[in-house]
């Protein structure tokens, strides 16, 4: 009920921020990704690998993903291809590499905590807006800091709060798949059978 299109086929899509669909694969059950990839990477990272096969290597692209597709394994796989990834992530997927980030209760609105892996190729950032959001990135960290406007219940007006660059870019670049869905809905071609 909370998904925009709960019915129909499940399709994994790689899209540009402007909604242009670059690649897609239909979910076909356990045969969607290889068993070897599934064991090594898990489903989310395996789908990232599958979709990124069409992305030219060594062009230093940055892929933005939601929490289902973001993990340390997917970031490391893409780094081997000189492709970067930024995405929200579930706490159980950050491993011991970046597990000492501050929690929701330790941060005030507009504050963040950043940890960088020993090889300095991956960083984890937790930023508190109304709730905290956890991101992993191999292409950008919290610097330079930007700002954003958010509604303050106490002041009853919009206030400016600091926002790490990784959050700013994630918000700016995500949404291409949803935009592509909207474009397709606007251009539906109905086929009638006799």
Language-model features: locations:
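Acidic, contiguous segments within the catalytic cores of piggyBac-derived transposases
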Residues: 1-194
